């Protein structure tokens, strides 16, 4: 699933601790993720949010991080190993046209789609595939950079999510990001 995918080497910059100044994973994720949850993270890069997700779900939870770039997945695995989170973080390589998460049908409690939907070839199929993984009542946090996704494009993503059975539960104020919380 790739339209204009972030280059693999940019993953190192996106995983920088300095990024916490604008995108604090704990602050963003803590209201939505609890111990024991199963979380799906499409487009995790090298795991900036994945590591915090792994800490939040705890030893009884699971994070499935899916990316189309092998080097991103390799970097994520290294970082998860260093953080001692490989027991709960699974990094998968996606196909160009599918996340490859059919085995998660109806099993996911929360999806983090942070800065990724604008990179997929079509939002509709992406949201359909993601929606199929969600349990009834489960949530998806959609966040897109204002510098890459204008208001009209973001609304188009929300409409595509709606057609996939996801309802907007609220808009979130996240600085440089356009964001909404959706629910199945």
Over which residues does each language-model region extend?
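A short acidic, Gly/Pro-enriched loop at the edge of an enzyme's catalytic core
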Residues: 97-110
